Amino acid sequence: IKKFKLSNYFKNVAIRPGKPILFAKFKNKEKSFFGLPGNPISSAACFRFFVYPYLLNILGVKSEKSFKARLKNKFEKKKNLTRFIKSKLITTKSGNLYIEVLTGQESFRIKSFVKSNVWSLFKAGKSTFKKNEIIDCYIPLGWDKNHFL
């Protein structure tokens, strides 16, 4: 950071997957810098939830909104972490949306990422999420017709 004269805005945040992440700006310049983690799912999550919204913002594109779905199965996590969870979105015949938390949530596990079709957001401050609880969800990049890659 010192060598390249960066102003450190944040380094490491309390999320999983996604450690470590860095966002900085070059001092006296209008250039930004993201440092993404090495594990594939951590990198994908950080790009999706930090880099992509940043790019939309500097381009003046309206930020996206999450959509809501009910949790199909109970989920537990550490209370102090926000978790971006690889999930499967399911639509019932009556049109209700449910998410199923997939097994294999470790940041090096790609199979569950390939099987997923939605990111579920489990916010910090709570450790247990009950069946049928309403959860914020985000479509993976490339699936949203209102935004571009």
Model-derived features with residue positions:
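Flexible glycine/proline-rich
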Residues: 2-149
